[in-house]
Design a protein with these regions (language model features):
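Active-site cavity-forming subdomains of large catalytic enzyme subunits
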Residues: 1-16, 42
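Hydrophobic helix-and-loop "lid/oligomerization" segment in the mid-to-C-terminal part
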Residues: 14-236, 244-247
Length: 250
């Protein structure tokens, strides 16, 4: 993810300039970002996350401590994915990511407490909106299809990704959640299931899309509203053919 790339640039700069700065103190940021962005935990990602989790468990930043209070035991990938990550992402989805930046670099405990309370309120609001969208989206699920592709008017764009993840929990298939972002344009988030490269399937549909980007397990896209049915059927056909007409299993 972008945070991991930034970290590699910092370490390369240190090597080039022979700097004595200990860059390992930033690995907690890398772990949080890599896991929250659902990046594959392979190769260097896996190594950086391993060491980043060690930093979080041994010397957590002041801004993280309130989040950690509600978690029992050692912080691992799962606890970041399901507890800390959603709170971090909620700020950007519901208001602005700057709140999280300010929180993570804050060294005053009182200011950090105030910021973490703000984040918690945003997360609670996100959960209410998410539940409403999930309830609407579930009514569009077709159990006979190999994909979940749903679209709703007025859905908050900030929760589309997590709604897609929630739908996968109920119906284990590659999932796309879309809403109308502006006049006649649909914007959406894509989430995949284990071992299925959803980005490749999007690439095979690119002629019907205005824009798309992401990686194997998560992506975003835009398309004309008039192309929705064409895209929905094309994506379904590609996924169905690629898995040999066998339904996904956990």
């Amino acid at each position: 993810c972008g945070c991991g790339i930034a970290y590699k640039l910092i370490t390369a700069h240190n090597t080039f300039t022979e700097s004595s700065i200990d860059t390992s103190i930033f690995l907690d940021f890398v772990a949080l970002a890599t896991i929250s962005d659902m990046m594959p935990l392979i190769d260097e990602n896996r190594i950086m996350v391993f060491h980043g989790l060690n930093v979080i468990n041994s010397k957590p930043r002041i801004g993280l401590r309130n989040f950690l209070k509600s978690i029992n035991g050692k912080i691992d990938e799962s606890k970041i994915s399901f507890n800390i990550g959603p709170r971090i992402n909620a700020a950007g989805r519901m208001k602005t990511g700057k709140i999280i930046v300010d929180l993570l670099i804050e060294e005053d405990i009182n200011i950090a407490n105030s910021l973490s309370n703000d984040v918690e309120h945003l997360n609670q609001n996100r959960r209410r909106i998410e539940k409403s969208v999930v309830d609407e989206a579930l009514s569009q699920i077709d159990n006979q299809r190999y994909t979940n592709i749903v679209c709703g008017e007025g859905w908050n764009q900030g929760v589309l990704g997590i709604v897609a993840s929630r739908l996968i929990e109920r119906s284990y298939k590659p999932t796309i959640v879309l809403t109308e972002s502006n006049d006649e344009i649909l914007t959406g988030s894509v989430r995949s299931v284990k071992d299925y490269d959803v980005y490749k399937s999007l690439s095979d549909c690119q002629e019907t899309l205005l824009q798309y980007g992401g990686h194997k397990y998560a992506a975003g896209l835009k398309l004309k509203k008039s192309n929705f049915d064409i895209f929905k059927n094309q994506f379904e056909s590609i996924v169905k053919d690629s898995v040999g007409h066998k339904m996904f299993t956990r």
